[in-house]
Amino acid sequence: MTATASHTRARPLGASEIEHATRIAEPDFDLLDALYRTDDPDDQARLLARVVLSAFDNYYAVSRRIPALAQAAFEARDWPVTVRLSKIRIGLYTACIDQLVPLLKAGLPELTTDEQLWPTAEAELLAAIEGRYEADFAFAFWQSLRRKLVSDEWRPVSYDAGSTARRTTSPAAVLKTTTTTLPITAEVIAGILGDAGFRVPWRDRDGDAALAAQAIETALEPLSPRPGEPVKIEIADAGFFRNRGACLVGRIQLRDRGDMPMRNLPLLIALLNEKDGLVVDAVLTDSDELQYAFSSTLANYHATNPRYHELARLLYELMPKRPLGTQYSCIGFHHLGKVAVMSEILAEHRKTKERLATAPGFKGTVAIAFTMPSSAYVLKIIRDHPTDDYKFDYFDGLDEVLRKYNLVHEIDRAGSMLDNIIYSNVKLDRAMFAPELLDELLEAGIGTVTLDRGALVFRHLIVQIKLTPLPLYLANASAAESRAAVINLGDCIKNNAAADIFNKDLDGRNYGVSRIRKVYLFDYDAVEPLTSVTVSRDGAAPGEFDNGMVFRPQEMLEGLRIDDPGLRRAFRDAHPELMQADYWEGMQRALRDGKVPKVMNYPASRRLQR
C-alpha cells in the first residue's frame, strides 16, 4: 500500500478500467509459429518452454494487479466491484490455461503423445525460471497445462525440488516492526494505522486507536505484562482486502524476561470504510478468532504484498491449527495450496501408518466420505447413484453434483461453507485404504474409481477440512456447547443466504462443527441459488418442497431434525426471522438488486464499543 493518505473520497473504478486491467494478453503468436514450424526436437523443447512461460507471465501480471484493484474498490466503497474481482481472480488461472491448450493441440498435435519432448522442455523451463521468486508457481502452471494436454494423472509434484528449491521461508521479509514499551499507547496504534497508507480519510483515527489500544491491553493481561516492559509489534507490510472489509495482520511479542518465556499474541485489526471514513471495527487477538476471519469458508483475501510464501508462513504461525496448505488458498494461491494439501495427506499417512476408512457420522446418500483418524482432512467421491435413502425424486448425476461443488469453490462462501479442493485423475496407493472402504469405493463409484494394479485411480477426488457432523457433535457436547452450535447453525444458514446459496436439504447431517466450534455446510449436492427458489407463505399445502424448489420457512425446524426441545427453542429464539417468508423474500430482493449483504467474519464481542 502507499504511504500517503488523501482526504478526498476515492474515485469508483469504471467497468472499462477493470476490463482492461484484468484482460489476459494473447499468447505470443510469433513463438507459437516458430514452434509449429520447427522439426528439431531441441528447438521444439526450447520454444515450448518459452511459449508456456510467456503465458504464465501474462497470467501472473494480471493476478498481481487484482489486489491493488481490490484496495481501490474498498477505498471507493464499490462493493459490487469487490465481488467481481474475486470472481475474476479465481477463474483467471484456468482461463489462461484454456486459452493456450487448443492452440497447442491444433498446431502441434504430437504434444499429446510425445513422451520424449516433455522432459526436455521441462528442463528448459526450470532453467528459465531459476532464481525467480514465483518459480514454483510457474512450474505449477506448467504441470497444469501438461495434464490438460496429456490427460496425465495428477500428482503432488515437489515444486520446491531441483532448480526451484528455496530456503526455509521466514515471514520476516514481509513484516514491519514497531518497538515500544508497555503499555501500548494510542499514539503507537495511530502510527500503525497511519502507516497502512490508505488513500481515503479516517473518521476518527485517534479515537479508534485509543479504543484499539485498550482492547490490546485487555488481551495482554493473561500474559502477565509489566509497565515499561519492552514490546515488539510486527505488522505484515500488506493490506488484506475482501468484500466490504480490510484488515491489518501481525502479532505482538513480549520478550523472555527470566520469570516468563517469550510470549506472542496474534493481532488482526479489522477495518471498514463507512460513508464518513475509515473505522477500526474490531480487534482480534485470539488464534481461533483469526482462523475464523481467515477461514477457507470465506472468499479469498487479496493481499497487496506479492511474497506469498512469507505471507502463508506468517498466517500459519498465527493460526497453527490450520494446515499450511490452506493458508496459501485463503490468500488466493489455490494451485500451490492444492499441492501442499495432497502432500500433507500423504505425509500424514507415511507418519502415522493409518489407513483411510469411512468418515465418522451418517452414511452419505450422494457422497462417500473417508479419512484417517488423525488427519486434518476428509476425502470424498460422488456415488454413481444415490442410496435408497435419497430424499428427492430426481438425481442430477455425478457431473452436475461436481458442478455444484465447483460453484461453491468459486463463490464467496460467506464464512459458512467449506471450500473444496477437487483433484482429477489422482492415483493413491491401494495400501492406504481399509478393505471395507476399498470395496465400497469400487462398488458404488464405478464411474469414478478404478483399480490399476497396486493403486486406486480417482477420476475426481474432493478434499475438505475435517469437521464433526452436527448431530454427532450435539450427542457429545455440553448443554452450553450444544446451544452455541445450534445458534451458530442459524448464522450459517443466514450467511449462506447472503451468498445466494440455499440448501434445499436442510438436514442437520449436512452441517458440521470445526475445531474452533464454528458450524459450516459441507455437502453441496442439494444447493441451489436462493434467487431461484420460490418462498411459500403460511397456508400453502403441507410438505417441505415442491419439485425441490419451493421452500416453506415455517417448516425449517422440522427439516433441520433438531430433536431436543430446548435446542429447538434456542434456535427459534435466536433466529425467528428464519421461519418467516418476509426475511427470505427480502434477501432475494437484495441479491437481485446486486447488493452485497453484510457477513459477520468475526465475533460481535470483538467489535469496538463506541
Swiss-Prot record:
It is found in: Cytoplasm. It comes from the Bacteria. ATP binds at residues 359-365, 380. One of its GO terms (biological process) is glyoxylate cycle. Bifunctional enzyme which can phosphorylate or dephosphorylate isocitrate dehydrogenase (IDH) on a specific serine residue. This is a regulatory mechanism which enables bacteria to bypass the Krebs cycle via the glyoxylate shunt in response to the source of carbon. When bacteria are grown on glucose, IDH is fully active and unphosphorylated, but when grown on acetate or ethanol, the activity of IDH declines drastically concomitant with its phosphorylation. Its main location: cytoplasm. This is Isocitrate dehydrogenase kinase/phosphatase. InterPro entries: AceK_kinase, AceK_regulatory, Isocitrate_DH_AceK. Pfam families: AceK_kinase, AceK_regulatory. GO terms for cellular component: cytoplasm. GO terms for molecular function: [isocitrate dehydrogenase (NADP+)] kinase activity; AMP binding; ATP binding; phosphoprotein phosphatase activity; protein serine/threonine kinase activity. Its EC number is 2.7.11.5, 3.1.3.-. The active site is at residue 419. It catalyses: L-seryl-[isocitrate dehydrogenase] + ATP = O-phospho-L-seryl-[isocitrate dehydrogenase] + ADP + H(+). The lineage of its organism: Bacteria, Pseudomonadati, Pseudomonadota, Alphaproteobacteria, Hyphomicrobiales. Keywords: ATP-binding, Cytoplasm, Glyoxylate bypass, Hydrolase, Kinase, Nucleotide-binding, Protein phosphatase, Serine/threonine-protein kinase, Transferase, Tricarboxylic acid cycle. Belongs to the AceK family.
